[in-house]
Amino acid sequence: MSRLDEVLGTAILKGKKALGKEAPEVLRLPLDLLRVRGQPRRRFENLEALAESIREKGILQPLLVRRVGEAYEVVAGERRLRAAAMAGLKEVPARVLDLSEKEARLLALVENLQREDLNPYEETLGVLALLSEDLGKSVEEVVGLLRKMKNAKEGRVRDNVVPTAEAQRVEELFKALGRMSWESFVQHRLPLLSLPEDLKAALEEGAIPYTAALELKKVKDASLRKALLEEVKAGLSLRELKARVRGVLRKEKAPRPWPKEVAAKLARLDLEALPPERRARVEELLAELERVLEGPR
């Protein structure tokens, strides 16, 4: 029994039995009786290739489902189901498991987290969903709990602000998942939740690594960020990106010219040498400045 089995209990054990000697018999279920559930995996890549493989060889691994009323809910195998529909199949092989709603949610979340093609953003949502399900809290409450745990560890709040039992459970789950510590998750993954939409999209598409997304997040100017994003997609290294971002941030923080410097530039300015439109704009601004300066104090 693995650490994850011990922590999450019967849901995972039932899923493993479905793949072993105690597996229920394989049934052929019509596609129109199958329903999918919400899950952290939003993208389904290479469906056409899988659909072609299914046309040639069929579905090699049965779906895992549970009975819900007159239909069946897919617990594991949504990608195969979608590809089967693309391939024109009318029915698919499946094993029916006796799972409660909570067990089904846990098993589906763990199945998705164990996939190799989850990108960091989807994985982050999946981990939060798993914690939410296990702790009986909303995702927002889980995020708040994790941040309180971090603050408590760093001595910024009193320890008793964080419920001990919940903190211990969080630590157990992260150890069982074996991916990263909860501290690393808070530091490196929670910031992904507040990414601008363009960076979220690029991350979900697998176009950029999450480290680049976090670096690009520092650039507030959308047009500059877009230009840098395209460079990252074209192969700009993280080291080069960090240097570019530092340059952008330096310019953003640079002090604006002092009045004397502006006055010196105006003294050197030859208005007659400017193009008509630009000269008219400068004269308009100078007139506005004069009105402001001569106004009541």
Curated annotation (Swiss-Prot):
UniProt xrefs under SUPFAM superfamilies: KorB DNA-binding domain-like (SSF109709), ParB/Sulfiredoxin (SSF110849)
Organism: Thermus thermophilus (strain ATCC BAA-163 / DSM 7039 / HB27)
Coiled-coil positions: none
InterPro entries: Chromosome_partition/occlusion, ParB/RepB/Spo0J, ParB/Sulfiredoxin_dom, ParB/Sulfiredoxin_sf
GO molecular function: DNA binding
GO annotation terms (biological process): chromosome segregation
Keywords, sorted A to Z: Chromosome partition, DNA-binding, Plasmid
Name by which UniProt lists this protein: Probable plasmid-partitioning protein ParB
Gene that specifies this protein: parB
Assigned protein family: Belongs to the ParB family.
GO cellular component: chromosome
Pfam family, one: ParBc
Signal peptide (residue range): none
Function as written in the Swiss-Prot or TrEMBL entry: Probably involved in plasmid DNA partitioning.
